């Protein structure tokens, strides 16, 4: 039985900030990274919140995430830009990209900025809401490692590839943020930590059969051994699996 302990936002903010400072990020960088993570937790998206700390730390130790990476704008027009991320922290690159997009949109009416050679950037919706707070329509999408098993497939071929949209509206802003898979890898990590079986219809084992074994699915994803997470819509075109597969493409 999982045991839960409650901590205040202030406690978690300090803990995460101290951790990322230990990782080598400066104060301003820590503020951005931690805000993205804790915003996710406040929204109830625990899969993309501070539970990612361990995975980020491992990424830094392995050199997959470059703490001192300096992003470079390698292409730019009045309405668009491409940023070379140099394998930096995803949250910092996502924040920089949306900041540039907002600036361009305010001048030209539209701003489109893409990032290459980045890392996991947290919830896509955070960046869409950055634009919404400025009175603009914001969109944010990203690819990821292969975790989605295409309709009728056995092996993960596509990422969770989320789509997020935020726009000003009355009485409340419109906000949508969803992966194109049934769930994300992060959700499987949460179930694994809680030692809970996965609900039916979430994942496939390496033989293409439905499974509730979170540790096994995660291990297969890492090893690229087959299996993975189902597309939005599940396993069959009858339930709309082809739609999640198509959105992911």
Enumerate the predicted regions with their spans.
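Generic N-terminal amphipathic, Lys/Arg-enriched alpha-helix
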Residues: 1-23
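N-terminal and secondary-structure boundary signal
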Residues: 21-24, 39-46
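Short, well-structured alpha-helical segments
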Residues: 27-38
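Active-site cofactor/substrate anionic-group-binding motifs, chiefly glycine-
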Residues: 49-102
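Residues forming anionic-ligand binding surfaces in small-molecule and nucleic-acid pockets
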Residues: 74-84, 95-111, 208-231
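A generic, well-ordered mixed alpha/beta core segment in the N-terminal half of proteins
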Residues: 82-170
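Phosphate/diphosphate-binding glycine-rich loops and adjacent basic-rich segments that engage nucleotide
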Residues: 148-222
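Internal helical hairpin/lid segments
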Residues: 225-249
């Amino acid at each position: 039985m999982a045991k839960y302990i409650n901590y205040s936002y202030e406690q978690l903010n300090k803990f995460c900030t101290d951790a990322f400072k230990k990782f080598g990020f400066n104060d301003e960088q820590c503020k951005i990274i931690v805000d993205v993570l804790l915003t996710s937790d406040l929204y109830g998206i625990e899969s993309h919140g501070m539970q990612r700390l361990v995975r980020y730390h491992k990424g830094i130790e392995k050199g997959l995430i470059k703490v001192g990476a300096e992003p470079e704008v390698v292409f730019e027009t009045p309405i668009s830009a491409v940023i070379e991320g140099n394998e930096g922290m995803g949250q910092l690159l996502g924040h920089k990209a949306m900041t540039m997009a907002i600036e361009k949109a305010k001048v030209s009416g539209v701003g489109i900025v893409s990032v290459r050679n980045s890392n996991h950037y947290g919830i896509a919706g955070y960046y869409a809401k950055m634009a919404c707070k400025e009175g603009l329509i914001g969109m944010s999408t990203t690819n990821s490692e292969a975790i989605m098993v295409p309709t009728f497939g056995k092996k993960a071929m596509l990422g969770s590839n989320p789509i997020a949209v935020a726009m000003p509206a009355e009485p409340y802003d419109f906000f949508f943020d969803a992966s194109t898979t049934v769930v994300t890898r992060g959700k499987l990590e949460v179930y694994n930590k809680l030692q809970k079986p996965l609900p039916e219809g979430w994942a496939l084992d390496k033989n293409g059969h439905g499974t509730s074994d979170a540790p096994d699915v995660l291990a297969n994803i890492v090893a690229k051994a087959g299996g993975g997470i189902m597309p939005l819509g599940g396993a069959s075109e009858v339930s709309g699996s082809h739609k999640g597969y198509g959105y992911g493409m």
